[in-house]
Amino acid sequence: MQYNFVKSTLVAAAALACAAGALAQEQVVKIGHSGPLSGPNTFAGRDNDNGVRLAIEDLNARKINVGGKTLKFELVSEDDQCDAKAGVAVAQKFVDSGVRYVMGPYCSGVTIPASRVYDGGGTMVSTVGTNPKITQAGYKNLFRIVASDEKAGSNMAAYAANVLKVKKVGVIDDRTAFGQGLSDEFAKEAQKLGLTVVGREFTTDKATDFMAILTNMKAKQPEVIFFGGYAPQAAPMARQMKQLGINAKLLGGDTLCSPEMPKLGGDAVNNVVYCAYAGMLTDGDAGAKAFQEKFKKRFGQNPDVYGPFYYDQVMNIGEAMQKSGSTDPVKVGAYMHQQAYKGVMGEYAYDDKGNRVKAPIVVMTFEGGKAKPLASY
């Protein structure tokens, strides 16, 4: 009896020792996600969250070893509501809790003020915020993983002038840092190309009724209307353009490439909406096809606009940790500045300000409710 007790005790002690050893050889790396997990842009926030989640699952399956320890990646998600005040609070929460890698924010108006907090706390930020100001603040460990407004806006102006062959354009923006910045770049390039901006109207990122500003715009007879804003506004805007008999095309940035556009706008978006998708043509690409299939199997739906980019950047970070032999954001960031990464959505290489070098743009429209690529820049 005494022998059995001693034997059981020794076995239990050995098991605890093994467990303790396993824990000692494991290092937790938290990846934060700041995005709109409530409100009209929830669909985008959830998609981005899924991209991060899938990458974390893939990285954990690889059992990356750094400094003799197996890295265990964990996702920590917070709802910034696409609101600057909420986003700054999320940033402070992440910094205070020791999160040193953050994916997001999604909205430029959140990214601009939150980046200061992240930089002060030594946290790496990887954002899809496209306003040029984001990478002009001098933060050393901030990465913009898609093209900026400068490229998206100017490319859409070039498409309007050279492909659609229009002469008169109207501009509407939602007064957000993203929408206004993108519209400014479009208008500036349009004028350089000899197009006439016949009118500029303003709305908000909460509006759904655009009849008044569209009526004003209709009187000026633009051939295209450029909208700087998000899909939850662009879709009803397309519907109301149709109701008013406005025959102009509706142009915009990558947010208008979302599958939410045909869901919310119906057939009003078909061959009317043209958007600047911040990715590459992936038709026929085996890697992109495999990713889409894996994403759909895991989450029951196809990825939206940015989910694949979030996935790529988290995988990029994981590889950089492995290759640099460190989980220190400064060392990992330095490696990412020096070495390009080939992901699902192309190559990720960054300049000294954190802008993605040669970030691709694909102009797309919708046919039968599905996105159709037209041209790449």
Enumerate the language-model features and the residues they cover.
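Extracytosolic ligand-binding ectodomains
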Residues: 2-14, 24-377
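N-terminal signal peptide c-region/cleavage motif recognized by signal peptidases
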Residues: 19-21
